[in-house]
Curated annotation (Swiss-Prot):
<feature type="site" description="Cleavage; by granzyme A">
    <location>
        <begin position="244"/>
        <end position="245"/>
    </location>
</feature>
<feature type="transmembrane region" description="Beta stranded">
    <location>
        <begin position="167"/>
        <end position="183"/>
    </location>
</feature>
<keyword id="KW-1210">Necrosis</keyword>
<feature type="region of interest" description="Disordered">
    <location>
        <begin position="229"/>
        <end position="250"/>
    </location>
</feature>
<dbReference type="GO" id="GO:0005886">
    <property type="term" value="C:plasma membrane"/>
</dbReference>
<feature type="cross-link" description="(Microbial infection) Glycyl lysine isopeptide (Lys-Gly) (interchain with G-Cter in ubiquitin)">
    <location>
        <position position="190"/>
    </location>
</feature>
<feature type="cross-link" description="(Microbial infection) Glycyl lysine isopeptide (Lys-Gly) (interchain with G-Cter in ubiquitin)">
    <location>
        <position position="192"/>
    </location>
</feature>
<dbReference type="GO" id="GO:0070273">
    <property type="term" value="F:phosphatidylinositol-4-phosphate binding"/>
</dbReference>
<dbReference type="GO" id="GO:0005543">
    <property type="term" value="F:phospholipid binding"/>
</dbReference>
<dbReference type="GO" id="GO:0005546">
    <property type="term" value="F:phosphatidylinositol-4,5-bisphosphate binding"/>
</dbReference>
<keyword id="KW-0472">Membrane</keyword>
<dbReference type="InterPro" id="IPR041263">
    <property type="entry name" value="Gasdermin_PUB"/>
</dbReference>
<dbReference type="GO" id="GO:0050829">
    <property type="term" value="P:defense response to Gram-negative bacterium"/>
</dbReference>
<dbReference type="GO" id="GO:0001786">
    <property type="term" value="F:phosphatidylserine binding"/>
</dbReference>
<dbReference type="GO" id="GO:0022829">
    <property type="term" value="F:wide pore channel activity"/>
</dbReference>
<dbReference type="GO" id="GO:0070269">
    <property type="term" value="P:pyroptotic inflammatory response"/>
</dbReference>
<dbReference type="GO" id="GO:0042742">
    <property type="term" value="P:defense response to bacterium"/>
</dbReference>
Length: 416
């Protein structure tokens, strides 16, 4: 299930840009990070591609050319172009029954109601200003954060945003029940309550981007149509996948991907397993902690070094073998887990409860059964059919539960 915030951002995109290329902000934590003139990277993950903030703006990388650049920056943004109001009123119920071999039945039901009303404004960089970004000179001394960007990834400029006009408090009433009838017992999950989120004014709900191209180390261009490489000098560049999601072919490969992730974690000692498990468990329901850990693991993967003063040292040290050499596959497995966690919202509560009660194995079996039914439907779909977001969430849930279970079960070897 999507969070209240992500539900409204998806509604905004659907109503304001149906079939277009506007991107919904997924987390309130990110609602202040994708503004006009900001530079965002594109990260390729198993669950598709997503944007991440670089912490940079155009001013950080372009040659200012005296004070002229400041005038251009001020005049480039048209400001509040228009205001809109969106009303979303939904009352829904549903039921799920799955029968497995060996007298196991999994049943579920849900009820939901939400009434959302939100006022938004549109901000965009003028087309006239964007045209001036052709063949622009870069600064001689570029920031380290720019130089450390993976040149196999693509870089984009935020050119348009939809933002809240005033503080908005959104509410959603939901009730969930999931239970299993087993020959030797049963397991149930119940949740009832009202979800609420308060969004401050001037927070970005969705945004649009244009790709930036760096033909060499001195100049930059803006790319208006289609997709290309942001760093064409790189031979091994990855193609852009903006707007793509996990497809049926990827879902069939998910088992192999998960087996690789589990395999690379099997070599951890019992102490390192506990360190990793404790660190990942802290991310459940804490998006700010998840983002911070993702950034630190990514930095270690790029530098290959461990900083002794790092607050996440127990987990980060587990990324290195006994000889002090970074095990890249292990770091990537942790990042894949954090990517999967990003797909989940309320499901994280079920995972945390199962982890606490020691019922992860049964939860894994439940999710696997429902997921395989989704795979059967995907197999009969056309190859170019977009992957169902709900099915993607189910796959992410399976990955999260499987990795936590692998870490909780104990080591099979102690080679590192």
């Amino acid at each position: 299930m999507f969070s209240v915030f992500e539900e409204i951002t998806r509604i905004v995109v659907k109503e304001m840009d149906a079939g277009g290329d506007m991107i919904a902000v997924r987390s309130l934590v990110d609602a202040d990070r994708f503004r006009c003139f900001h530079l965002v990277g594109e990260k390729r993950t198993f669950f598709g591609c997503r944007h991440y903030t670089t912490g940079l703006t155009l001013m950080d990388i372009l040659d200012t050319d005296g004070d002229k650049w400041l005038d251009e920056l001020d005049s480039g943004l048209q400001g509040q172009k228009a205001e809109f109001q969106i009303l979303d009123n939904v009352d829904s119920t549903g039921e799920l029954i799955v029968r497995l071999p060996k007298e196991i039945t999994i049943s579920g039901s849900f009820q939901g109601f939400h009434h959302q009303k939100i006022k938004i404004s549109e901000n965009r960089i003028s087309q006239q200003y964007l045209a001036t970004l052709e063949n622009r000179k870069l600064k001689r001394e570029l920031p380290f954060s720019f130089r450390s960007i993976n040149t196999r990834e693509n870089l984009y400029l935020v050119t348009e945003t939809l933002e809240t006009v005033k503080e908005e408090t959104l509410k959603s009433d939901r009730q969930y029940k999931f239970w299993s009838q087993i020959s030797q017992g049963h397991l149930s999950y119940k949740h009832k309550g009202q979800r609420e989120v308060t969004i401050p004014p001037n927070r970005v709900l969705s945004y649009r981007v244009k790709q930036l191209v760096f033909p060499n180390k001195e100049t930059m261009n803006i790319h208006f149509r289609g997709k290309t490489k942001s760093f064409p000098e790189e031979k091994d560049g990855a193609s852009s996948c903006l707007g793509k999601s996990l497809g049926s072919e990827d879902s069939r490969n998910m088992k192999e991907k998960l087996e690789d992730m589990e395999s690379v974690l099997k070599d951890l000692t019992e102490e390192k397993r506990k360190d990793v498990l404790n660190s990942l468990a802290k991310c459940l329901g804490k998006e700010d902690i998840r983002q911070d850990l993702e950034q630190r693991v990514s930095e270690v993967l790029i530098s290959g070094e461990l900083h002794m003063e790092d607050p996440d040292k127990p987990l980060l040290s587990s990324l290195f073998n006994a000889a002090g050499v970074l095990v890249e596959a292990r770091a990537k497995a942790i990042l894949d887990f954090l990517d999967a966690l990003l797909e989940l919202s309320e499901e994280q509560q079920f995972v945390a409860e199962a982890l606490e009660k020691g019922t992860l194995p049964l939860l894994k079996d439940q999710v696997k059964s429902v997921m395989e039914q989704n795979w059967d439907e995907l197999a009969s779909s056309p190859p170019d059919m977009d992957y169902d977001p709900e099915a993607r969430i189910l796959c992410a849930l399976y990955v999260v539960v499987s990795i936590l279970l692998e870490l909780a079960e104990g080591p099979t070897s102690v080679s590192s």
